[in-house]
């Protein structure tokens, strides 16, 4: 069964790409998409960029430039060594961040058709609250 799941985080003020990635990185999120960094500077152009892991600062700079130019930019992040994660969307307004959990998704043991929202929330709320998080909206639809 295909599901549409996402998390939308809102902030009190515009938050930069570096602010988000620094906070998430300190908590255990890494830009490791099977050994490389995968990101979109402009989601609308459809072409993903890939870089070696040691070129993370250059990827962040490109993401920041994309958002500053008015584009929705994304980067794949995973939780430490689990490979669980997804695509994090950065919006030009800077007051919103979205996660589409598409990599090795965690489902509930008692209801495996549903995403384990708590698994994700327990790894995201702390670091994002530290940079001004004011709200979260989740969706899990068949």
Residue ranges and their predicted role:
Residues 1-44, 140-142:
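Short, extreme N-terminal segment that most often corresponds to the first beta-strand
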Residues 10-14, 44-46, 80-82, 104-106:
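Generic structural motif
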Residues 20-24, 46, 103, 112-115:
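Surface-exposed beta-strand edges and their flanking turn/coil or helix-capping segments
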Residues 53-142:
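Charged interaction segments
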């Amino acid at each position: 069964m295909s599901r549409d799941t996402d998390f939308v985080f809102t902030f009190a003020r515009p938050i930069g790409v570096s602010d988000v990635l620094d906070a998430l990185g300190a908590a255990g999120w890494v830009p490791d998409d099977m050994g490389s960094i995968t990101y979109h500077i402009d989601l609308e152009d459809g072409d993903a960029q890939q870089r070696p892991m040691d070129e993370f600062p250059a990827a962040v700079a490109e993401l920041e430039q994309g958002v500053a130019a008015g584009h929705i930019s994304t980067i794949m992040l995973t939780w430490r060594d689990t490979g669980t994660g997804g695509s994090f969307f950065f919006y030009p307004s800077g007051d919103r961040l979205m996660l589409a959990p598409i990599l090795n998704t965690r489902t509930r043991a008692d209801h495996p058709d549903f995403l384990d929202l708590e698994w994700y929330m327990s790894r995201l709320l702390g670091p994002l609250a530290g940079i001004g998080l004011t709200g979260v909206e989740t969706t899990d639809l068949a």
